A protein has these predicted regions:
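A structural signal for well-ordered alpha-helical segments within the folded catalytic domains
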Residues: 12-19, 36, 133-136, 145, ...
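WW-domain-binding short linear motifs
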Residues: 49-53, 154, 178, 182
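Short, small-residue-biased leader/transition segments that mark boundaries at the very start
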Residues: 1-8
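C-terminal, low-complexity/hydrophilic appendages and adjacent surface loops
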Residues: 57-152
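Charge-dense polyanion-binding interfaces
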Residues: 159-184
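Polar, surface-exposed loop/tail segments
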Residues: 9-65
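Non-transmembrane alpha-helical segments in soluble domains
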Residues: 18-22, 26, 39, 71, ...
């Protein structure tokens, strides 16, 4: 039986937390919600997803199947095109500058389903995390759980790259994200 402090080794994403809480409190999640309840994992270790997509804004876009972690970097040092999409033009600690807003454009209201036809700004970003200097990396969590020694396996990389493209499409990643990391949509 599972208890406090147990570790679950199934793929999950942050977006799975709200559906889990909604199920616990017997609230129907909105139809546009992409996450999955973690209840099957918690109750009987049943997987809810084959892959987890993650990353950092403007940095690596990553995917894992639980065994391997594939970290795709930007294709060139300029790390472009890169845009911030926001309904609230603020950074964590300050509002966007006049210069930033002068380059902003209002997106098509149908650009993202989850915005429910609300407008969002598309703001060019000219500085970000430098994933290029690290390059694209592949790790085997079975032999290298601390991800210290990247491996090279084109078959695994191709497989995870295809899964990454599918998940990016499913999550409505803007088309320029594919271009930024050198993938065709």
């Amino acid at each position: 039986s599972r208890g406090l402090g147990d570790v679950y080794k199934r793929q999950a994403q942050t977006i799975d937390i709200v559906p889990t809480l909604a199920e616990f409190f017997q609230i129907a999640p909105p139809e546009y919600m992409d996450g999955h309840s973690l209840t099957p994992v918690i109750r009987n270790d049943t997987p809810i997803r084959d892959y987890a997509l993650f990353g950092i804004f403007g940095g690596h876009i990553c995917i894992t199947d639980g065994r391997y972690v594939y970290m795709r970097s930007c294709k060139d040092p300029e790390n472009q095109p890169l845009y911030e999409y926001t309904a609230m033009p603020c950074h964590m600690d300050r509002p966007f500058s006049r210069e930033e807003m002068s380059e902003a454009e209002l997106c098509d209201k149908n650009a993202f389903n989850f915005m429910k036809k609300s407008g969002v700004f598309k703001v060019p970003v000219h500085h970000s995390t430098d994933s290029y200097r690290f390059g694209t990396m592949l790790f085997d969590l079975l032999t290298d759980p601390e991800q210290k020694c990247p491996i090279h396996d084109s078959n695994i990389e191709d497989h995870l790259c295809q899964a990454m493209k599918k998940m990016m499409k499913d999550n409505q990643a803007p088309k320029e994200q594919f271009e930024r990391i050198g993938l065709t949509e």
